[in-house]
Amino acid sequence: MVNDASSISRSGYTQNPRLAEAAFEGVRKNTDFLKAADKAFKDVVATKAGDLKAGTKSGESAINTVGLKPPTDAAREKLSSEGQLTLLLGKLMTLLGDVSLSQLESRLAVWQAMIESQKEMGIQVSKEFQTALGEAQEATDLYEASIKKTDTAKSVYDAAAKKLTQAQNKLQSLDPADPGYAQAEAAVEQAGKEATEAKEALDKATDATVKAGTDAKAKAEKADNILTKFQGTANAASQNQVSQGEQDNLSNVARLTMLMAMFIEIVGKNTEESLQNDLALFNALQEGRQAEMEKKSAEFQEETRKAEETNRIMGCIGKVLGALLTIVSVVAAVFTGGASLALAAVGLAVMVADEIVKAATGVSFIQQALNPIMEHVLKPLMELIGKAITKALEGLGVDKKTAEMAGSIVGAIVAAIAMVAVIVVVAVVGKGAAAKLGNALSKMMGETIKKLVPNVLKQLAQNGSKLFTQGMQRITSGLGNVGSKMGLQTNALSKELVGNTLNKVALGMEVTNTAAQSAGGVAEGVFIKNASEALADFMLARFAMDQIQQWLKQSVEIFGENQKVTAELQKAMSSAVQQNADASRFILRQSRA
């Protein structure tokens, strides 16, 4: 159809003024273009037929005609539908010599159908745009509501984090032995649970906001695309709808951009405050662990000092008993005619050799030799007595650690004295008699222990510092009663009996020395155990410090990830603004054209 305009200059009516006059006269007289075209066609045909009868040549011209130029594209776009139809009819006039009226009617019908199709398409696109615009509006409202929910969740999380920090500080200021420590610990646990729930709610709200923002952006872009497509329609009514929708869409894009900027600000602020809260919490935990490590370090040093002091004291006691043993052996030599000198020499040699070997290797062979007795006899007896005393002391209100220490020491002493009594009985009475007296000895020791333990507990509760002195007196008295009941007391003894008795006393002192050393080892072991527990707590606190450092590192990494999310949101907002600007420039160019 565009090239049809160029055919005007080639048509025959420009060379025949009567043909042109007949065509234009018919168009001017009738407003019905189809009828006018039909009449013009008939007039043209009649005129042309008359010319043929008159013998007029097509190349002849009675008057000079002015060459006309076809209208420009800009002029055609400014024409109304009636003007465009007039232009079309004018073009059709140039083809009347080559086409028939039926062809003209067919082309007019096609043109009218095309116009109606464009109109229907414009209306359909307008409906789609209105639907997309409504969806974009709903998505934008949902995005705004999600931002408000995120802000509320953030406020709840900040309050929970603050409450947790306060509870942690309160817990760190208390000692585990304080009455309110358990309540403070429960408050910390509850605050931690609330903070975790608030954090999860905040994360869910943030994710929902991100999804809502993405959905709102996609629907706004969909509306923009439909608007761009809608601008191609030629219907005037549709153009008015497009203009109104364009204004609404531009306002929605601006609103969406503002909401995205608000969300980016909230996310950035939340990320910074979350990192600050985590740092404050980790600093509080770190300070508490440092204080605990210092406390456990002091306890470890104190328990180690006690163990060393106990070891030194028991070493002195061993040396004193060893010296007394040597003296008793020498004195016994006077009554035995030197027979016990060998025992004294052996005892002295054994004592010196044991000290030398212990100094060189750190191991006492006397202690190693007595280990089976310690494991199968003394240790069970000490544990039985120690547990009984510990339970009784705890019943009187003594703390567990002090009760265990006192029970271990008293149990070791009573077991050692019991072993001395057994050895003396075996040496004096004989193995057979000792075997027969085993049951009686067990019963007597049981009665003695039953009498001894309440007295020890009573003295511990009443006199405190006089406990061990009076306890030893009662133990000695009890053992004297045991000897009396077993018939060990005699009249005046001969020299040989005195010497033998002194030798037995020396043997008992040696066993007592070993038992005392073992009791000292038990006490030292208690202190070493306490030191080990303090060291274990110290290592646990150190591990907690390492874990806190790991948590701090994870918080920094999370902060970096949140910053990436913020950057992506800023990029999306910039893209939306850029698309809006491009659409605005396109609309401006179209309006100028």
Swiss-Prot record:
Keywords: Coiled coil, Host membrane, Membrane, Secreted, Transmembrane, Transmembrane helix, Virulence. Residues 151-208, 287-314 form a coiled coil. The chain crosses the membrane at residues 330-350, 409-429. InterPro entries: BipB-like_C, IpaB/BipB/SctE_N, T3SS_SctE/BipB. It is a multi-pass membrane protein. One of its GO terms (cellular component) is host cell. Pfam families: SseC, T3SSipB. The keyword Transmembrane applies. Its main location: secreted. The keyword Membrane applies. It is found in: Secreted; Host membrane; Host cell. The core secretion machinery of the T3SS is composed of approximately 20 different proteins, including cytoplasmic components, a base, an export apparatus and a needle. This subunit is involved in the formation of a pore, called the translocon, in host membrane. Component of the type III secretion system 1 (SPI-1 T3SS), also called injectisome, which is used to inject bacterial effector proteins into eukaryotic host cells. SipB/SctE1 and SipC/SctB are inserted into the host membrane where they form a pore and allow the translocation of effector proteins into the cytosol of target cells. Belongs to the SctE/SipB/YopB family. This is SPI-1 type 3 secretion system translocon protein SctE. It comes from Salmonella typhi.
